[in-house]
Amino acid sequence: MSKLAGHRNVAAVTRSALSLSFVAACVALLSACIQNQPPATLPGTTPTVWTGSPAPSGMLGAEAESMGPPNIITRLNAPDGTQVATAKFEFNNGFATITIATTGVGHLAPGFHGVHIHKVGKCEPSSAGPTGGAPGDFLSAGGHFQVPGHTVEPASGNLTSLQVRKDGIGTLVTTTDAFTMNDLLAGQKTAIIIHAGADNFGNIPPERYSQVNGTPGPDATTISTGDAGKRVACGVIGAD
């Protein structure tokens, strides 16, 4: 055999060895990528390629929760301490979404119930109002909440009424841009109150109704309270 032929054979063997080494390396790399993967459930499919370590348990839920809008959840109780409803305040895009849901049945009478934010974060049964007077349930929560600089009616804390069904269950979802989360939590905080009756929102047309003294339209009490009656459930916003 000539020296030239010998050199050619050696080169061919070297190339073959390198090719086999390259193929073996690829196979090893592919095996490392797909090891411990569950078998495919459909014929002709391959396992999903794994791209990293699994997230710690609960991480995805925690991240999803942290990405949600800021919110406050408040429990509303009757004067005897029985929970009547929950209220969730969510703040996003410059407005608040309030969701109120009754808990249990029989705590609220069927029909409409006025709902307001009150200006003092207190829920004391048989208490006097901030300016004194005869005691009553949750009177220490004061009147309807007004944000700083807002003095006209409807008050900043006026909300849509809650309608309770015949079975004693009710749900309300309403929105407002009349206050922010900081407004509700500032200073002495605020309270959300459900009343015994419906709120007329001071809608007493003067061309149809007059006060007992002959003055047309609603009086100051109707304008400020909506004639919604007793306070039957209360929750301090931000207390939970």
UniProtKB/Swiss-Prot annotation:
It is found in: Cell membrane. Cu cation binds at residues 116, 118, 195. Its main location: membrane. Disulfide bonds join 123-234. Its cofactor is Cu cation; Zn(2+). A lipid is attached at residue 33 (N-palmitoyl cysteine). GO terms for molecular function: metal ion binding; superoxide dismutase activity. Keywords: Antioxidant, Cell membrane, Copper, Disulfide bond, Lipoprotein, Membrane, Metal-binding, Oxidoreductase, Palmitate, Signal, Zinc. GO terms for cellular component: plasma membrane. It is a lipid-anchor. It catalyses: 2 superoxide + 2 H(+) = H2O2 + O2. A lipid is attached at residue 33 (S-diacylglycerol cysteine). Pfam families: Sod_Cu. Its EC number is 1.15.1.1. Destroys radicals which are normally produced within the cells and which are toxic to biological systems. May play a role in favoring mycobacterial survival in phagocytes. Belongs to the Cu-Zn superoxide dismutase family. This is Superoxide dismutase [Cu-Zn].
